[in-house]
C-alpha cells in the first residue's frame, strides 16, 4: 500500500527559526540524523521541506479570471512543512515510520493518507 505522509509543523523548531537556534547543536544534529535515517528507510520516497506558509501564494480561478492571494489558503496552526511517500505493508507500518519523524514529537503531527489505487 502506498501512503503520503504530510508533515504538519505545528510548533516544531525548523532550521532558520528562533526555536531552532535555541536547540543545542547535538539536538539539531539528532533532528537531521533522524530525517536522514527515515529517508534511507526501504519504501520511502523522500519529499522536500517547504518554506513557511507566509511565503505561499494561493491561486483561484473565478469567472475565468486567475486570482492570487499572498499567504496560505487557510490559516492553520499546524502548517504543512513537508511530505514523503511510503510503500508499506499496512497502516501499522506507516504509523511506526510516522512516529520516528521528529515533527511528531516536537510539537507537530503527521497525517497519513492512503494513495488512491495503490
Describe each PLM feature range.
Residues 1-118:
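Conserved, structured core segments of small domains
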